[in-house]
Amino acid sequence: MRIQTLNRDYEILRMAESGERMDVLIARDEKHPEEGKCMLVILKQETDIHRFLPFLAAQQENDPFDDFMGYFPRDGRLYIVFRFSDLMPLRERLSQDTGFEERIMIAGNILKRLVFLHLPAYFQYEVLGEGNILAAENDDIRFSYVFHEPD
C-alpha cells in the first residue's frame, strides 16, 4: 500500500495501531529514503482534526522539533508524520543489567532530549508515557509519538 502526496511517496510497511479515532502506520518515503522510517498518525474524526490543526501548524515553526516532519489532509483525515526509531522501550533497556550510574546517564539523556527538541507540553506528556521512551544500547534516547486517544 502507498500514500502519495505532491512531495512524498510513503510505502506502508505495517500498521502499528488501529483505533476508532486514529491509526498509526510505519512507513518509508520512497522519494526520500535517506530520512529513514517514519510514523504516520492518522486522525479520523473531524473534532480531533480541528483540535490538533492549529497546534500542528505552530510546530512547523519549531525547528529544533525535528522529529515532527509535517502533516497533510487526505480523504477527510489528518496525517501527522513523525520520525520513527526502531529501538527498544526504556523498560526493556532497564531490565538489562544496568547499574545506578548508567540509569542516571539514561535519565539525563531523557531530559537532554526533551530540552533539545523544545517539545511542546502536550508532546512532553505523550512521549513520557509508558512505552514511548525508546533507548539504544549506547543510551541514546528517542521518542515514539503514539498518542493516547484524545478525550
What spans do the regions from the language model cover?
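Activation segment of protein kinase catalytic domains, centered on the conserved DFG
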Residues: R93-N109
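Structural motif in protein kinase domains
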Residues: F84-L94
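Feature marks short, surface-exposed loop/turn motifs that line or immediately flank catalytic pockets
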Residues: D75, M88-P89, P150
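ATP-binding glycine-rich loop module of kinase domains
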Residues: R2-D63
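Short beta-strand micro-motifs within the conserved protein kinase catalytic domain, predominantly
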Residues: D67-L78
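Short, well-ordered beta-strand micro-motif
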Residues: I26, V81-R83
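Protein kinase-like catalytic core scaffold
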Residues: P64, I80, I141-S144
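Catalytic-loop of the protein kinase fold
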Residues: G70, M105-A107, L114-E149
